[in-house]
Amino acid sequence: MKSQLLSLAVAVTTISQGVVGQEPFGWPFKPMVTQDDLQNKIKLKDIMAGVEKLQSFSDAHPEKNRVFGGNGHKDTVEWIYNEIKATGYYDVKKQEQVHLWSHAEAALNANGKDLKASAMSYSPPASKIMAELVVAKNNGCNATDYPANTQGKIVLVERGVCSFGEKSAQAGDAKAAGAIVYNNVPGSLAGTLGGLDKRHVPTAGLSQEDGKNLATLVASGKIDVTMNVISLFENRTTWNVIAETKGGDHNNVIMLGAHSDSVDAGPGINDNGSGSIGIMTVAKALTNFKLNNAVRFAWWTAEEFGLLGSTFYVNSLDDRELHKVKLYLNFDMIGSPNFANQIYDGDGSAYNMTGPAGSAEIEYLFEKFFDDQGIPHQPTAFTGRSDYSAFIKRNVPAGGLFTGAEVVKTPEQVKLFGGEAGVAYDKNYHRKGDTVANINKGAIFLNTRAIAYAIAEYARSLKGFPTRPKTGKRDVNPQYSKMPGGGCGHHTVFM
C-alpha cells in the first residue's frame, strides 16, 4: 500500500510540475513520427484552404496587403496563433516588438523622358532634385568606385556585391545628391535600404534595361536627371508567433520558420503565404505523433523590411538558449508559378558561400528527398537574404527550400522542371497579382511534403548530424533582396 501511495504522489507531482513543456494529452499512445507517416498527413486541400484564408485577410481591408503592423497582417498573426494554440500540442507565444515601417514612391525623368522607378523603402525624401547623372564603377560598394566629380550629382549604380543600403551610404559619403540602383538581371528593381542611416541619399531602383541605357547615354554625353522621392515613416507594433512542441527534448530543438508578412503591393500569397502555410500544415500534421527532439515553429514578422522579426528573435536569445537550437530551416516562397526546386547551397559547392557546420548535411537531406523520387533539383545561393541570416550569423546550421522569385527561368531549367523559358519564376513577385491564383499547387504540395520529410528526420533523431558549432558571431554579408531585385531566398531586397 505504501509503495502504491508513493507512486501516486510521484505521478501527481509530475503532473503539477509539468506546466511548461508538459507532454500533450495522449502523448504516450501516439506513434513515433516517421518520414512516410508525416508526409502522408500532408493534404493539398489543407494547404489551399490555408492560403485562401490569408487571401481573405488581405481582401478584408482597403490596403489589400498583409504588411507588418497593418490590419491584414494583424489578422494573419491572430489566426496563426489561435490555430496552433487550439491543437493543445504546442506552447505558443506572440513575441511583441516595434519596428519602423516605411513606404516610398519615386518619379524619375532623364533628358525629358519619364522612367519607371521604385523608391527604396527607408530612402530619404527628395523634392525635385535636378542634377547631372554620373556612373559608379564596380557596383559602387567602395569609395574608390565613385567619380571625383560625384558631389551634387545623381549617381547610377549597378546592383550586386553589397547591399542597397551600403550603396546609398557610399553615394552619400561621395556627397551625391541621389542614387539610382539598376538591376543586374532582367526586370524592374524595388528594394529596401534596411533602415534609416544619416549617410543615405534619396535612392530609387530601376530596371536593367533602363539602367544600361542610361549608362550608355552617359558615356556618350551629359545626361540631366530629375528625381522625386516621397517617403513615409511610422513606428508599428507587430509580432512573431513562436510555437514549441510540449513533448521532446527541449535541449535539442529543431527549429523552422517562414515570414508571415507581405510587401505593400499585394497580399503576398506566394511570398510568403506559401511558406507560412507550408510550415503550419506540417505543424498540425505533427500533432498526430510523438517525437524525441522538440520542434519549434516560427512565423516571422517584418521580413520584407529587413529581416526584422527573425533578427529581433535571435538577438533576444543568449548563447546558452540559442545553443539549444541545433539547426534552423527556412521556407520562403515554395509555390512559385513557374517554379524550380531549389535547395540552399549549405556546403558552398555551387556558390562558394558555406553555412555553419551542419548546413551541408541539411542540404544533402533535402537532396535525398528529391533524389529518392527522381525529381530534379538545383542549389540556390546561401546569401543571407532571408530569415536564416540572423541564425547563421550566430553560427546556427541552416538550410531550406525556395522555388524562385523574379529571376527568369532558362531553357535548361525548363528541361528539368517544365514551365516557361524567358519568364520569371514568379512574375507576380512583390506585385498585387501575388494572389491564390499565383500559387503552383504541385510545387507547394511537393515542398510542404519536403518540409515534413526533414522535420520527421530531425525530430526523431540527430544521429549523424555534426555536433552543434559553438554559438558565436560569424561574418555574413547578406545579399538582401527579394523584392524585384532579389529573390526570396532571397528575400528582402537589400541587394
UniProtKB/Swiss-Prot annotation:
GO BP terms in the entry: proteolysis
Quaternary structure annotation from Swiss-Prot or TrEMBL: Monomer.
pH dependence of activity: Optimum pH is 7.0.
Source superkingdom: Eukaryota
Its EC number(s): 3.4.11.-
Protein's UniProt name: Leucine aminopeptidase 2
GO CC list: extracellular region
